[in-house]
Amino acid sequence: MSEKYVFSEKHPGPLVVEGKLTDAERMKTESNFLRGTIAEDLNDGLTGGFKGDNFLLIRFHGMYQQDDRDIRAERAEQKLEPRHAMLLRCRLPGGVMTPQQWLRIDKFAGENTIYGSIRITNRQTFQYHGILKSNVKPVHQMLNSIGLDALATANDMNRNVLCTSNPIESELHQQAYEWAKTISEHLLPRTRAYAEIWMDQEKVATTDEEPILGSTYLPRKFKTTVVVPPQNDVDLHANDLNFVAIADNGRLVGFNVLVGGGLSIAHGDKETYPRTASELGYISIEHTLAIAEAVVTTQRDWGNRTNRKNAKTKYTLERVGVDNFKQEVEARAGVKFEAVRPYEFTERGDRIGWVKGIDNKWHLTLFIENGRILDYPGRPLKTGLAEIAKIHKGDFRLTANQNLIVAGVPARSKAKIDALAREHGLIDDSVSEQRKNSMACVSFPTCPLAMAEAERFLPEFVTKVEGIMQQHGVGDEHIVLRVTGCPNGCGRSMLAEIGLVGKAMGRYNLHLGGNREGTRIPRMYRENINETEILAEIDRLVGLWAQDRLQNEGFGDFVIRTNIIRPVLDPARDFYD
């Protein structure tokens, strides 16, 4: 079951919102193309953090300043500042890296971060948590030495470009991946600030220009995907700009373009809402960059710079109308959209385990719970991946489900890699389908926005859900379950069959009614309830689903069909009904 979203064409709003600009716009204007005084701040040893505008400017360089919230109160009692440390997120379009790159990334995590871990994110890249100020410059230089960077992985730019992790159809995946890289490069900022600050490159006497992003960059974050049906592993409806691959005899010929998805909301603010992306039409492959640029520049010029909570592309589309936005994109690109070509999504989970590609090479998708790579007692995952990287000749591919694919394994190496993976706990045949299809954002202790636990809450919570599933005779099946520690949506709960959104410590809003394909937004079913209440609801509803579902009917479709909850059809207008 997949409802058709209806977007009203009654859009009285202006193309450009007038009014006082947010302070973020002042900060960008005065930053000298994202330089600020970051270089000087690096030399200030009196604080472990960045001061003033630099606190926000470092985000354009791929970093967030955080502190350990588990010890924040204790340090305050001791009259100490919070233990500031940076999160750094790598730019890795399509999630592909070499084993040699992985070994350097692994080494830095072990030697130069507080937590010693690598976190695979659902933005198909990795991030470090706990980088002290003294290690900030070295991490950028390390990434540069292996051909990577952290530019534009945060703040008001086009973020890391996602691409379907499809190891089966190798040729089609490769074409999609090349486009993900090309789009990422095309939409990067042109400022030399990153190279000057982190790579010590000399300042040149030329004026910086940003022909695509503009001198004040975008009004808000902007996310892009390249997706190969029938897999929707990238969760395209969480993204501003999506290129849905259309193939002919296994060759990529063009894309359906969908614009304006996004999941972030603010508790208590009904002017914010999640939204699925709208179809603009089909383009042939040679128009890809022109359309990408036109969508970005239209959002650059029409996006709301007076209110950051209403600044994303989804709100621009609702204000000006999809047709007006589409016509502007066509005019800027010099390209007319054709009618959308047929496509269908059937799943979005990863194929865990070994699969054979059409090129006769093998691909091993490893389930990494929460994407957290660390040596756990009895499960030395981090060591195991390093051992595999030492002998593997293909790629490592990170997925948007926070897993890792050891890709391109020749038949002669399969047994050795399988043995290493099992020896280090990277393959566990007992992992349930439910656990494989559950996901959480990071939340506590490092995220400053966290309201409730997510990553640390999920494993034990899933164990309890597994027990409920077993009790009702559906233990071999799964419900797409997502937990996010606040309403910003990083855990993508707003595209789950069961979505938990953090409200306060130990309390969540319970959303129901998304679907397995990730094309429907779930509606809030219960507000501000604790784990015991959540599990009681899941127990009751899973019991009904197990007893009364149709053949192959997913949980989310069941609760809609049986009127347990109404579907969200026009999120801007009926999400809060």
Swiss-Prot record:
Pathway per the UniProt entry? Sulfur metabolism; hydrogen sulfide biosynthesis; hydrogen sulfide from sulfite (NADPH route): step 1/1
Entry keywords, A to Z: 4Fe-4S, Amino-acid biosynthesis, Cysteine biosynthesis, Heme, Iron, Iron-sulfur, Metal-binding, NADP, Oxidoreductase
Name any one GO molecular function: metal ion binding
What task does this protein carry out? Answer: Component of the sulfite reductase complex that catalyzes the 6-electron reduction of sulfite to sulfide. This is one of several activities required for the biosynthesis of L-cysteine from sulfate.
**Where do the annotations place siroheme binding?**
C490
| Record flagged with keyword Amino-acid biosynthesis | yes
* Stored Gene3D superfamilies: Sulfite Reductase Hemoprotein, domain 1 (3.30.413.10)
According to its UniProt record, the EC number is: 1.8.1.2
Q: How is the cofactor bound?
A: Binds 1 siroheme per subunit. Binds 1 [4Fe-4S] cluster per subunit.
Q: How does it assemble?
A: Alpha(8)-beta(8). The alpha component is a flavoprotein, the beta component is a hemoprotein.
Task: Indicate which residues the UniProt annotation says bind [4Fe-4S] cluster.
Answer: C441, C447, C486, C490
Q: Name any GO cellular component annotation.
A: sulfite reductase complex (NADPH)
Which GO biological process entries does UniProt record here? Answer: cysteine biosynthetic process; hydrogen sulfide biosynthetic process; sulfate assimilation
Q: Name the coenzymes or cofactors required.
A: siroheme; [4Fe-4S] cluster
Similarity field = Belongs to the nitrite and sulfite reductase 4Fe-4S domain family.
Q: Which organism is it from?
A: Pectobacterium atrosepticum (strain SCRI 1043 / ATCC BAA-672)
PANTHER family in the record:
SULFITE REDUCTASE [NADPH] SUBUNIT BETA, SULFITE REDUCTASE [NADPH] SUBUNIT BETA-RELATED
Could you tell me the gene encoding this protein?
cysI
Classification of source organism = Bacteria, Pseudomonadati, Pseudomonadota, Gammaproteobacteria, Enterobacterales
Enzyme class, broadest EC rank: oxidoreductase
Q: What is this protein called?
A: Sulfite reductase [NADPH] hemoprotein beta-component
The record's catalysed reaction(s) read: hydrogen sulfide + 3 NADP(+) + 3 H2O = sulfite + 3 NADPH + 4 H(+)
Task: Look up the domain of life of the source.
Answer: Bacteria
